Swiss-Prot record:
Native source species: Mus musculus
Residue stretches making up the EMI domain: 33-106
The gene coding this protein: Emid1
Mod. after translation: O-fucosylated at Thr-42 within the EMI domain by FUT10/POFUT3 and FUT11/POFUT4.
UniProt subcellular location: Secreted, Extracellular space, Extracellular matrix
Protein name: EMI domain-containing protein 1
Compositional bias of kind Low complexity: 232-243
Residues of this chain annotated as glycosylated in UniProt: T42, N51, N136
């Protein structure tokens, strides 16, 4: 639930008393006044909503005096208001099931719910002008004052109804015992309690009425809809602090510090070895007695490599070593350029004549072949291709893809392109000749 409906429920929750569904007046004297129950009622109210959008035509500026053909439109917001209707949910106080009367003290044995008449429901309708701004929460104080004024009127009307002499009610007047729903507002805090003090203690319960066949039978209706959600609870106490986490990793090294101050000019540190491990200083003033020799110091770091020495004399030749393993074969080299063509050699001497061979045996006679088999097949294939080319040319001429000039001889034999097109456009049927391959006897 969000939007205006949520603001409506929030305003009603601030105005109406909180707590449970049943309302009770404190004090032992008013112990019978706790028979009020809240019911959720849905109403339709009117609101003024700003809605004034319309399309505006924008003309384009043209450099020439004539008008431009193109126009554009844009959406413009104009401060207009129109009346709309909203459905709001409110809370009303009525007698709980099983109780009746003006103050909801009279109990009924069957736990029956009150019967609301149509006239009472019409009087409880909310006027659209009463809710200014569609239940705006900025006027809470004004709504509170109006609610107190309505409670005072309800108390006055309740007192006047008690002073009216009671008459034996007929079955048609049974709805009047419940009071007017519009005249009964939500219970207040102090003003209603002060007026209840002046009424006095309730009278004794009257005798139970007899059963009558004409009396209306009241049946308990279904339960009402679920009420609005309650107010949010208070903020809980702060929890106990957690345990200390493990130490974090070491941070990066810091930047180098400033240089140390320069020492006195007479405090010369020995240049032999590390200055921090040396205790030899130049004495000034009086001479102190020489002490015993101390233990040798730790070895110093190796010095830098010196310059290479002169080459020594050549040594004696060594013994020949063993033959090594042959290495792998190298990659194949590139082919060289072809050499020049040599001179033609002298012709050789003719060889001796060979002996005449023995004649071979005659071979078997072959089968008689078919006469002009391959030639006839090739000729038929050539004729079929020629016929196919002529038919394709005829189709192209009929469709209009290829229109040869008159008298050029490009068209097929026996076909006229203008007559074909004329017959096609005029709608007259034209008998086209069907070309069939000529026989061999006809060609000869």
């Amino acid at each position: 639930m969000g939007g205006p409906r949520a603001w409506t429920l929030l305003c009603l929750g601030l105005l109406l008393p909180g707590g449970g569904a049943a309302w009770s007046v404190p004090g032992a004297r008013f112990s019978g006044r706790r028979n009020w129950c809240s019911y959720v009622v849905t109403r339709t109210v009117s609101c003024h909503v700003q809605n004034g959008t319309y399309l505006q035509r924008v003309l384009q500026n043209c450099p020439w005096p004539m008008g431009c053909p193109g126009n554009s439109y844009r959406t413009v917001v104009r401060p207009l208001y129109k009346v709309t209707y909203k459905t709001v949910t409110a809370r009303e106080w009525r007698c709980c099931p099983g109780h009746s009367g003006v103050t909801c003290e009279e109990g009924s044995p069957g736990l029956l719910e009150p019967t609301w008449t149509d006239s009472g429901m019409r009087r409880m309708a909310v006027r659209p002008t009463a809710l200014s701004g569609c239940l705006n929460c900025s006027k809470v104080s004004e709504l509170t004052e109006r609610l107190k004024a309505l409670e005072a009127k309800v108390a006055v009307l309740s007192v006047t109804e008690q002073t009216v002499p009671s008459v034996p009610a007929t079955p048609e007047d049974s709805a009047l015992l419940w009071g007017s729903p519009a005249a009964r507002g939500s219970p207040g805090d102090g003003s209603l309690q002060d007026r209840l003090d002046s009424w006095g203690l309730p009278g004794p319960t009257g005798p139970k009425g007899g059963t009558d066949s004409q009396s209306p039978v009241r049946i308990r209706g279904p339960p009402g809809p679920q009420g609005p959600p309650g107010r949010p609870g208070q903020t809980g106490a702060a929890g106990t602090p957690g345990k200390m986490g493990p130490p974090g990793p070491p941070g990066p090294p810091g930047p180098p510090g400033p240089p140390a101050p320069v020492g006195p000019p007479y405090g010369q540190v020995s240049l032999h070895g590390d200055p921090l491990l040396s205790n030899t200083f130049t004495e000034m003033g009086s001479h102190w007695p020489q002490g015993p020799t101390g233990p040798p110091g730790p070895p110093g770091p190796p010095g830098p490599m010196g310059p290479p020495g002169l080459p020594g004399p050549m040594g004696a030749p060594g013994s020949p070593g063993h033959m090594g393993i042959p290495g792998p074969s190298g990659p194949k080299g590139t082919s060289g350029h072809p050499g020049e063509k040599g001179e033609r050699g002298l012709p050789g001497e003719p060889g001796p004549q060979g002996l005449m061979g023995v004649p071979g045996e005659p071979g078997p006679k072959g089968d008689p072949g078919e006469k002009s088999h391959w030639g006839e097949g090739l000729h038929q294939l050539r004729e079929a291709l020629k016929i196919l080319a002529e038919r394709v040319l005829i189709l192209e001429t009929m469709i209009g893809l290829y229109e040869p000039d008159l008298g050029s001889g490009a068209g097929p034999d026996g076909t006229g392109t203008p007559s074909l097109l004329r017959g096609k456009r005029g709608g007259h049927p034209t008998n086209y000749p069907i070309i069939t391959p000529r026989r061999r006897s006809e060609r000869s």
